[in-house]
Swiss-Prot record:
This is Odorant receptor 1a. One of its GO terms (biological process) is signal transduction. Belongs to the insect chemoreceptor superfamily. Heteromeric odorant receptor channel (TC 1.A.69) family. Or1a subfamily. Residues 1-39, 93-125, 199-256, 309-359 are cytoplasmic. Residues 61-75, 147-177, 278-287, 381-392 are extracellular. The gene is Or1a. One of its GO terms (molecular function) is olfactory receptor activity. Odorant receptor which mediates acceptance or avoidance behavior, depending on its substrates. The odorant receptor repertoire encodes a large collection of odor stimuli that vary widely in identity, intensity, and duration. May form a complex with Orco to form odorant-sensing units, providing sensitive and prolonged odorant signaling and calcium permeability. Involved in the behavioral responses to butanal, heptanal, and 2-heptanone. The keyword Transmembrane applies.
Length: 392
């Protein structure tokens, strides 16, 4: 049993598992092609795109009903998010695979930080598995709750009347049992795509943020050994190794920022609408409301937001901690003034590059406040419109 748990908590196990369910390989061969099964991936994308079109058609038909439109908007935005994130992931797959290798490479040695990396990585995989269970619970409750209610109604009344909380305008009649079964099969692909794409991409971002943070800690461990090897007689004062490692780490941060910038931007923009739609479902309830799905989905959206914002915040804090340690450890009083400026100015300027962004957004705690305020403003507006036009 312990061996099985150790496998599940292995490096990138959750990410590799979820990407494999979509026909992708996160650790490809030398050719670097991550798309292992194009047919499976295309089926998932096509079924999701089809359901997105039916959601848009429903919103157009019911554009005067705020509650129904907000629920359809919630489903539509999540499908748009999944499609965009996976499209960006495929477009930048080579960069992401290279980023994974760069983050892993310093932790191969059997040192203290390598041991900490394995420990933190196992903890991260445990959190990723919990997040996967949240996404799976969202998908399962979304499909099984309406099916169970439909079967219960059929058993009690003998009438086949499908119950659904998915607001779509389908081009076929789901009141026929065989058509309803086919529609459920389509939804299996859609919900699997949502679950795996959300878990895979989001937890991969969290894994990269964890790796970069631990590399800063590793650099800090090297910095603490500086007093013993500081040599004023050398032209580089014995500090060249630290500066080389710091420059390499800054390149990794820049690579990390470049690889995930578009994905993070999609998350920030779409999550405001998602929060607004989710809140509206709680404050403006209606018939056939799937509260099990809403509960799981609320957890997923909140965790999703925390992964991106607090992950970026952790990288920034580790960089600041390294800067403070740099000033504390290096004997600046033994350096000539011109060398102090030569060392300090580039390092101070380089620290600004550790702020992870999403185009014109800077990921961190201030952005979290902005997202909640924006979602709250949209919710207040929709609630006012609902009270004015639909409660009288």
């Amino acid at each position: 049993m312990s061996k099985l748990i150790e496998v599940f908590l292995g490096n990138l196990w959750t990410q590799r598992f979820t990407f494999a369910r979509m026909g992708l390989d996160l650790q490809p061969d030398k050719k670097g092609n991550v798309l292992r099964s194009p047919l499976l991936y295309c089926i998932m994308c096509l079924t999701t795109s089809f359901e997105l079109c039916t959601v848009c058609a429903f919103m157009v038909q019911n554009r005067n009903q705020i509650v129904l439109c907000s629920e359809a908007l919630m489903h539509g935005l999540q499908m748009v998010s999944s499609l965009l994130k996976m499209a960006i992931f495929l477009a930048k797959s080579h960069d992401l695979v290279d980023l994974i290798q760069q983050i892993q490479s310093p932790f191969t040695e059997e040192d203290l930080v390598g041991t900490e990396w394995r420990s933190q990585n196992q903890r991260g995989q445990l959190m990723a598995a919990i997040y996967f269970m949240m996404c799976a619970g969202t998908s399962v409750s979304f499909l099984l709750m309406p099916v169970a209610l439909t079967m219960l109604k059929y058993h009690s009344t003998g009438e086949f009347a499908p119950v659904s909380s998915f607001r779509v305008l389908l081009p076929y009649d789901v009141t026929q049992p065989h058509v309803y079964a086919m529609d459920c099969c389509l939804m299996v692909f859609v919900l699997s795509f949502f679950c795996c794409s959300t878990t895979g991409v989001d937890t991969l971002y969290g894994w990269c943020a964890l790796g970069v943070s631990l590399q800063y800690r590793r650099l800090g461990q090297q910095l603490k050994r500086i007093p013993s090897c500081f040599n004023p007689s050398r032209s580089d004062f014995g500090l060249s190794g630290i500066f080389v490692e710091h420059a390499r780490l800054l390149k990794i941060v820049q690579h990390f920022n470049y690889s995930f910038m578009e994905i993070a931007f999609v998350e920030v923009v779409i999550i405001c609408g998602l929060y607004c739609s989710v809140i509206c479902q709680y404050i403006m309830p209606h018939t056939n409301q799937n509260f099990a799905f809403l509960g799981f989905f609320s957890l997923v959206v909140t965790t999703q937001l925390c992964i991106y914002l607090f992950g970026a915040e952790q990288v920034r804090l580790e960089a600041e901690r390294f800067s403070r340690l740099l000033y504390e450890v290096i004997p600046w009083q033994n350096l000539p003034p011109k060398h102090r400026k030569l060392f300090l100015f580039p390092i101070e300027r380089a620290q600004r590059e550790t702020v992870l962004g999403a185009y014109f957004f800077e990921l961190g705690r201030p952005l979290l406040v902005w997202i909640f305020r924006t979602a709250g403003s949209f919710t207040t507006l929709m609630n006012a419109l609902y009270a004015k036009y639909e409660t009288h």
